[in-house]
């Protein structure tokens, strides 16, 4: 049985090596993906209320796909940009 819709890629695909090219370290990747996943989750939560404060997923999604998997695919596709936050001046 063949289908034109591919299965969700999940957290193991895209590979971590490709994702690390978008950030300085694995720690910044975790923060980057977590923030975007929270935005996606908030977007889905506010849809029922008619508010559009957050931007929805920038890649095609599947019904049961988790926000973190969507965020990682967006980062891998180069659809998001991150900016370094300066620490407090001493």
Swiss-Prot record:
PANTHER family xrefs: DNA-DIRECTED RNA POLYMERASE SUBUNIT OMEGA
Keywords carried by this UniProt record: DNA-directed RNA polymerase, Nucleotidyltransferase, Transcription, Transferase
Gene3D superfamilies according to UniProt: 3.90.940.10
UniProt record, GO biological process: DNA-templated transcription initiation
Name assigned to this protein: DNA-directed RNA polymerase subunit omega
Similarity comment: family membership: Belongs to the RNA polymerase subunit omega family.
SUPFAM superfamilies named in the record: RPB6/omega subunit-like
Subunit relationships: The RNAP catalytic core consists of 2 alpha, 1 beta, 1 beta' and 1 omega subunit. When a sigma factor is associated with the core the holoenzyme is formed, which can initiate transcription.
Database matches in InterPro entries: DNA-dir_RNA_pol_omega (IPR003716), Pol_omega/Rpo6/RPB6 (IPR006110), RPB6/omega-like_sf (IPR036161)
Source organism of this protein record: Streptomyces coelicolor (strain ATCC BAA-471 / A3(2) / M145)
Entry EC no(s): 2.7.7.6
Underlying gene: rpoZ
Keyword Transferase: yes
GO MF, one example: DNA binding
């Amino acid at each position: 049985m063949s289908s034109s819709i591919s299965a969700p890629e999940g957290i193991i695909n895209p590979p971590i090596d490709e994702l690390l090219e978008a950030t300085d370290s694995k720690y910044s990747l975790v923060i980057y993906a977590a923030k975007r996943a929270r935005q996606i989750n908030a977007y889905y939560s506010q849809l029922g209320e008619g508010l559009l404060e957050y931007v929805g997923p920038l890649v095609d999604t599947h019904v049961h796909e988790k926000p973190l998997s969507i965020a990682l695919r967006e980062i891998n596709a180069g659809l998001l940009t991150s900016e370094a936050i300066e620490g407090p001046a001493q």
